[in-house]
């Protein structure tokens, strides 16, 4: 009984990995295109904007904060702007 359970718990993940690897080998260009699109999207959003203030960092205006953050005027700190 223990041997059969062990075989099931080893065989199922192994089958999943082999199937996923076969699918990716069948369509390698899709994976490359997806990665290229992801890098372009990050560049457009300014994810790596230099000198930006992170969450709860002090700021003078919203342009000082990193993407998806805005300067809150009450105490002049960067907080989430509500965007997705």
From Swiss-Prot:
Q: Which SUPFAM superfamilies match?
A: omega toxin-like (SSF57059)
Similarity comment: Belongs to the neurotoxin 10 (Hwtx-1) family. 41 (Jztx-36) subfamily.
Q: Where in the cell is it found?
A: Secreted
CC per GO annotation: extracellular region
Domain comment from the record reads as follows:
The presence of a 'disulfide through disulfide knot' structurally defines this protein as a knottin.
Task: Mark which residues the record calls propeptide.
Answer: 22-45
The protein, known as: Omega-theraphotoxin-Pm1a
User: Which stretch is the leader sequence?
Assistant: 1-21
Gene Ontology molecular functions: calcium channel regulator activity; ion channel inhibitor activity; toxin activity
